[in-house]
Amino acid sequence: MADVVVGIQWGDEGKGKIVDRIAKDYDFVVRYQGGHNAGHTIVHKGVKHSLHLMPSGVLYPKCKNIISSAVVVSVKDLCEEISAFEDLENRLFISDRAHVILPYHAKKDAFKEKSQNIGTTKKGIGPCYEDKMARSGIRMGDLLDDTILEEKLKAHFKAIEPFKEAYDLGEDYEKDLRGYFKTYAPKIRPFIKDTTSMLIEANQKGEKILLEGAQGTLLDIDLGTYPFVTSSNTTSASACVSTGLNPKAINEVIGITKAYSTRVGNGPFPSEDATPMGDHLRTNGAEFGTTTKRPRRCGWLDLVALKYACALNGCTQLALMKLDVLDGIDAIKVCVAYERKGERLEAFPSDLKDCMPVYQTFKGWEKSVGVRKLDDLEPNAREYIRFIEKEVGVKIRLISTSPEREDTIFL
């Protein structure tokens, strides 16, 4: 059976800590979408690990880690991540169906961002998915055969010829790209496998599989705050499509949310706090992007968005992250509805333009940092947790009270 860990905000919810906390109980940890635009940070024994492509199970020697077919892979960046770990043989597997991000994709991404101003990381994620959908991409499996790779490269060079000047690819682009693969393909080949068959077999044997999403539900290409979204499907449904596991294989869907809200880049954010309180949340929560180091926009918990995300994913339980960031705040707000042009909205709309937050205010608490038992939380903190559970209709099974793995309340 498989369990899914999915972010139910705009990403950066703390999925890495949760996966790291529970990965020891699983045989496989699988990253099922996105690219190295996503990042998750794990603090283990006081050491901070920033991962962008590697599944969070790499810190457990007995855990097998898979990068599945809907992930787009920068082989250069993945090789750099691999080099930071020892003995990944038979512990890391990359789907032969996963698509390869080319340097051209990053150039195209930067070119388009100048006019679109979406707030992308300009790492080539979107253009790589574009080529995938156009059926013209290079897949990881193509790196296993030099003849096939050369055929794919020739087709690529022909296709991008009209755009070389616009994307500033340079006169030596063809030579440089061949050299790029000559450098990195041999390093990555030992990890490329048919992971779809591997996971189907593991599921049939009853092995435990943890499916780890990147980014968050509200960035989903179809169901998120379009056009300010990522280029992949970020919901739990994508876990099946990417891995080859059928929906019957899914057992638990664990939705991850912070005790407040954050967003990176452009796009609507109804509960954003542009006052010094937003700065306080950013500073206390160390809200700076793992990948880009950009400061995250911060605000109050948005229950309209949270209920929507829980429904989309079929969440069976929640993990509430960074409760301690709210320590010492006298009045804590929660967005319980939107108001737009005099109309109250309690359902999440396809367009958040002109949506203003309707808040309910709660009394704060002094300290929750490092707490590991529910009864040790102050009454106001427990009331806040109970309110979220009641409104969303999903039980909170885990509460994080610091970045450390051990500072976790299990319910």
Language-model features: locations:
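Non-transmembrane, aqueous-exposed alpha-helical and coiled segments at domain scale
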Residues: M1-L411
